Amino acid sequence: HTNLIESLKNTVGTLFIKPKIDISKISKHALGIILSLQKNKYEAYIVGGAIRDILINQNPKDFDIATSATPEQIRRLFKKSRIIGRRFKLVHVLDGRDIIEVSTFRAKPQEREIMANGVERDNAYGTLKEDAERRDFTSNSIYFNPTNKKLIDFYGGIDDIKNKQLTIIGIPEIRFREDPVRILRAIRFAAKLDLSINSDITSIIHKNINLLENIPYSRLFDEVMKLFLTGHALKSVILFNKFNLSKKFFPVLQSTNPSTQAFLKQGLRDTDKRIHESKAVNPGILLAVFLWRDVNEAWEK
C-alpha cells in the first residue's frame, strides 16, 4: 500500500481537501475563466501567490491561472484577451481594468536558449506535473481547482508554509543560474511571508550575487521595487544587507549614521503602513528616501 501511495503522489501530486481555501477570496473574474476553460475540456487551476496568500490568511491581489490550453486556444476562447511575452507566451484576459494572467503548463525545454538578458527562452508546453517542476519555490507551486475544491501540491509547499521555510524546487544553484532574479524573489518572499532561508541556499545566493549584473536595469528596478513594496520593507532591508545587496543597489541602506538610519526607517515604516492600509504608494517617494542623503550632501557642498 505504501508503494502504491508513493506512486500515486509522484504521478498526480498530493491532493488535499484540508486546509480549505476560502472561495470568497478568489475574484469572480478568475473563477469565471477557470469555469470556461474546464467547460471546454481544458485543465485549469489557480496557482501561485494567490493560493499562498489565502493559506496564510491574507487577501490576494493578483490571480494567476495555469491551464492545458495553448495561448492561441485561450485567445480564441476569450474575446477580451491578448497574447503577450517573448520568453514565454502568456494571455491576459481582461474584464474592465481587471487583468487575469493565464499561462499554459510549461515543460523543461530539451535545449536551453539563453536570451540577451541572461534568461532562458522557454515556450515548451507540458503537463501539470512538469509545470509544477518549473516553478521557483514550493510555496508558489500549489494548485487549486475551485470546481472540486482540491489543492494539488507536488513539492510540499503547504508544509513549507506551515514550517516557515523557503524551499526552492530543484537544485538551487541551477535554478538561480537559470534566472538570477530568483535571488531577489527569494528575499522578497522570505520578508513578506516571514520564511527562513536555510544555510545551503544562503551560501548559494552569496556565490551567485554577481549574476544579477547580467540582468537588464529595467527588470532589476521592477524586482527591487517589488521587494520594498510588499508591506515588509524593513525586513527586506535586513535581508538586503545580509546578502550584501545594498552595496550594489542602495549603499545608503548600510549607513551607520544614526540620523540617516532614523530617516530611512521612518520612510520605510510609512511605506509599510500605507500598504497595510491599502493606500496608494508612489515608488518615487521611496526612491527619494533612498537617495536623499546623497542629494542633500551634494546640495550642502
Task: Name each model feature, range by range.
Residues H1-K301:
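Catalytic cores of the polymerase beta-like nucleotidyltransferase superfamily
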